[in-house]
């Protein structure tokens, strides 16, 4: 029983580490996108936003992906492009 608990705690620690890495990657990408948008002319920003939104609209998600997940992704992309980090 102790071995099972120790193994579960070890697996949980690994998952937590993976989660931290993913969070760091997302944060880094947000910073990069924000910096790029802030250094672009307004018309270039709008052109990029239109292209990204167009690409998202054209992509047909896999049937195995829940609609809520797809909508969450679209909303987050829109938020990041229209209202970058402060």
Curated annotation (Swiss-Prot):
Entry coiled-coil feature ranges: 2-36
GO terms, biological process: cellular response to starvation
Subcellular location: Cytoplasm
Signal sequence annotation: none
Keyword tags: Coiled coil, Cytoplasm, Stress response
Recorded GO CC terms: cytoplasm
Primary location: cytoplasm
Stored Pfam families: Anti-adapt_IraP
Disulfide-bonded cysteines: none
Subunit structure: Interacts with RssB.
Family: Belongs to the IraP family.
Function field: Inhibits RpoS proteolysis by regulating RssB activity, thereby increasing the stability of the sigma stress factor RpoS especially during phosphate starvation, but also in stationary phase and during nitrogen starvation. Its effect on RpoS stability is due to its interaction with RssB, which probably blocks the interaction of RssB with RpoS, and the consequent delivery of the RssB-RpoS complex to the ClpXP protein degradation pathway.
Protein name: Anti-adapter protein IraP
Organism of derivation: Shigella dysenteriae serotype 1 (strain Sd197)
Underlying gene: iraP
């Amino acid at each position: 029983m102790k071995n099972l608990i120790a193994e579960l705690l070890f697996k949980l620690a690994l998952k937590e580490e993976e989660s931290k890495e993913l969070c760091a990657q997302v944060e880094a990408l947000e910073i990069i996108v924000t910096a790029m948008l802030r250094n672009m002319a307004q018309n270039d920003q709008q052109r990029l936003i239109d292209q990204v939104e167009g690409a998202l609209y054209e992509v047909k998600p896999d049937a195995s992906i829940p609609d809520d997940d797809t909508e969450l992704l679209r909303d987050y992309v829109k938020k990041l492009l229209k209202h970058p980090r402060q």
